[in-house]
């Protein structure tokens, strides 16, 4: 028969092991440079609306489908991969007066926290999009600023699909718009990301 001391030792072992089991559910997902993921920005100024896009997005996401609030991720896109519908404008955008691709070659987006509504379950349902609020950091022109994004997360056995939208300002990232184009370039830039991350 099991004595009291043995029972206590077994109970302690189970309690200590529980956090390890919980952490084991976290999986690392990779965003590959395969054209499936994208980042888009829109400048809606009085005289012109400009849209730019890149499909050169890479990064990693560590997430537990049983508790999506623990998710963390880091993603980047090369500045030189941004494309609008105007080659000359693309050159200016990547130049030292704007995003300065030579000095700051990448734009970064980092997920630091995922927040759900008060009544929302932290566990993702397979193949169903879940609405989330994402807190993180956005780096452009060498300047990092906090961002809050609204979006969705959809999980399958081998993939996480994340969509998020947020707004950044050129002023926050120390990008000065020349007066001659001030009515064609907005200070507030709408950013949206569409990330397909596959399990390692």
Model-derived features: where do they sit?
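Bacterial N-terminal signal peptides
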Residues: 9-19
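Bacterial N-terminal signal peptides that target proteins for export
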Residues: 1-10
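Low-complexity, acidic/polar, glycine-enriched regions of mature
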Residues: 23-200
């Amino acid at each position: 028969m099991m004595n009291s001391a043995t029972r206590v030792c077994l109970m302690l072992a189970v309690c200590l092991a529980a956090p390890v089991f919980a952490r084991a559910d976290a999986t690392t997902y990779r965003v590959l440079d395969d054209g499936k993921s994208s980042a888009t920005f829109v400048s809606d100024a009085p005289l012109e609306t400009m849209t730019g896009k890149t499909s050169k997005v890479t990064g990693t996401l560590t997430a537990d489908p049983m508790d999506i609030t623990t998710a963390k991720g880091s993603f980047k896109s090369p500045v030189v991969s941004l494309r609008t519908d105007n080659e000359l404008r693309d050159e200016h955008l990547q130049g030292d007066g704007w995003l300065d691709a030579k000095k700051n070659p990448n734009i970064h987006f980092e997920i630091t926290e995922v927040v759900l509504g008060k009544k929302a379950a932290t566990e993702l349902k397979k193949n169903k999009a879940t609405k989330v609020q994402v807190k993180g950091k956005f780096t452009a022109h060498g300047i990092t600023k906090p961002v809050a994004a609204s979006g969705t997360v959809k999980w399958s056995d081998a993939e996480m699909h994340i969509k998020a939208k947020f707004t950044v300002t050129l002023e926050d990232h120390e990008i000065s718009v020349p007066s001659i184009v001030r009515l064609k370039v907005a200070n507030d830039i709408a950013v949206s990301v569409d990330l397909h991350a596959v399990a390692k």
